[in-house]
Amino acid sequence: MSFTVKVKEELLSLASRDKNELSAMIKMSGSLGLASSGLTLSVTTENAKIARHLYELLSDLYQVKSEIRHHQKTNLRKNRVYTVFLDQKVEEILSDLHLADSFFGIEAGIDQAILTDDEASRAYLRGAFLSNGSMREPDSGKYQLEILSVYLDHAEDLAALMRRFLLDAKTIERKKGAVTYLQRAEDIMDFLIVIGAMEAMAEFESLKLMREARNDLNRANNAETANIARTVTASMKTINNIAKISDNIGIESLPVDLQEVAQLRIQHPDYSIQQLADSLSRPLTKSGVNHRLRKINKIADEL
């Protein structure tokens, strides 16, 4: 499962019922049609769970029953596309969400009431990421979070929403639309907090620290003396084993005393055994630290 999907699944698990979240999803993925009964609304997504979330938002907030349709893409990816189709109270819903103008091309940006309210901004950003958000895998070392908009005005308003939370958001125009993006790891982690993806933020930070620790070890291997290199080699083995434990059963599954040593080793890959011992909440002998590290390595070997 990609990290983007993990974030979206966590957001869906929040079971939010916020009109501003729905507003973003309709604005970014919706289209209008005409039928004999009046206006129709279609909101498309390639994620079945997001389609279900849209269905439930419309039902809970406006007491309407939409229809979830699907078809297969004809390109090589062959992803299934889901459409949430509604032909009841469409004009009333658009008016309530202040979306009618944007659909008729008069206003492509975000409603001022959302732009000036923190909670509304959080919900709107959550809906925007669910609709058209994506992230690079955090362990790739090239950090980027993007949200694709049809119009540049909307992309710039999204950036303004992010800046309300002190995020260094930027925009760029591409062939398929305009992109609002973040490139600093700290901004991406803060964005995940803003939209409520706390578990994803914690995992992102852990992967980031792990990668930085490995990079520090690689640099140390090239620059330090033979004695330090031996320490680094042992540290590298332990960090790789900690990464293995994190990927398979989670560091939190370790006993508390081993968790503390594991976190210290990740945060300080260049520390000697003595430095690790001195940094523990309850100072330990070198022999005691070595014993705990051997336990960690043994647990990893048994996975």
Curated annotation (Swiss-Prot):
SUPFAM superfamilies: Homing endonucleases. It comes from the Bacteria. Residues 272-303 bind DNA. InterPro entries: Homing_endonucl, Sporu_reg_WhiA_N_dom, Sporulation_regulator_WhiA, Sporulation_regulator_WhiA_C, WhiA_LAGLIDADG_dom. The keyword Cell division applies. Pfam families: HTH_WhiA (PF02650), LAGLIDADG_WhiA (PF14527), WhiA_N (PF10298). Keywords: Cell cycle, Cell division, DNA-binding. Belongs to the WhiA family. This is Probable cell division protein WhiA. It comes from Streptococcus sanguinis (strain SK36). The lineage of its organism: Bacteria, Bacillati, Bacillota, Bacilli, Lactobacillales. The gene is whiA.
